[in-house]
Amino acid sequence: ADSRKPDDRYDMSGNDALGDVKLATYEDNPWETFK
């Protein structure tokens, strides 16, 4: 949802609000969330 996300694969909806939620979860625990 913003430039801090590792790449576009993690913003699957294209929706900024949901993208920000995914980004926060990724920052907290990237491997458990996206393994």
From Swiss-Prot:
Main enzyme class: lyase
E.C. numbers: 4.6.1.-
Record's comment on post-translational modification: Contains 2 disulfide bonds.
Residues bound to Mg(2+): 20
Domain of life: Eukaryota
One GO CC term on file: extracellular region
Cofactor: Mg(2+)
Tissues where this protein is expressed: Expressed by the venom gland.
A GO term, aspect molecular function: metal ion binding
Keyword terms: Cytolysis, Dermonecrotic toxin, Disulfide bond, Hemolysis, Lipid degradation, Lipid metabolism, Lyase, Magnesium, Metal-binding, Secreted, Toxin
Swiss-Prot/TrEMBL catalytic activity: an N-(acyl)-sphingosylphosphocholine = an N-(acyl)-sphingosyl-1,3-cyclic phosphate + choline; an N-(acyl)-sphingosylphosphoethanolamine = an N-(acyl)-sphingosyl-1,3-cyclic phosphate + ethanolamine; a 1-acyl-sn-glycero-3-phosphocholine = a 1-acyl-sn-glycero-2,3-cyclic phosphate + choline; a 1-acyl-sn-glycero-3-phosphoethanolamine = a 1-acyl-sn-glycero-2,3-cyclic phosphate + ethanolamine
Location within or outside the cell: Secreted
Record's cofactor remark: Binds 1 Mg(2+) ion per subunit.
GO BP annotations, alphabetical order: killing of cells of another organism; lipid catabolic process
Function of the protein: Dermonecrotic toxins cleave the phosphodiester linkage between the phosphate and headgroup of certain phospholipids (sphingolipid and lysolipid substrates), forming an alcohol (often choline) and a cyclic phosphate. This toxin acts on sphingomyelin (SM). It may also act on ceramide phosphoethanolamine (CPE), lysophosphatidylcholine (LPC) and lysophosphatidylethanolamine (LPE), but not on lysophosphatidylserine (LPS), and lysophosphatidylglycerol (LPG). It acts by transphosphatidylation, releasing exclusively cyclic phosphate products as second products.
Sequence similarity: Belongs to the arthropod phospholipase D family. Class II subfamily.
Protein name: Dermonecrotic toxin LgSicTox-beta-LOXN4
Organism of origin: Loxosceles gaucho
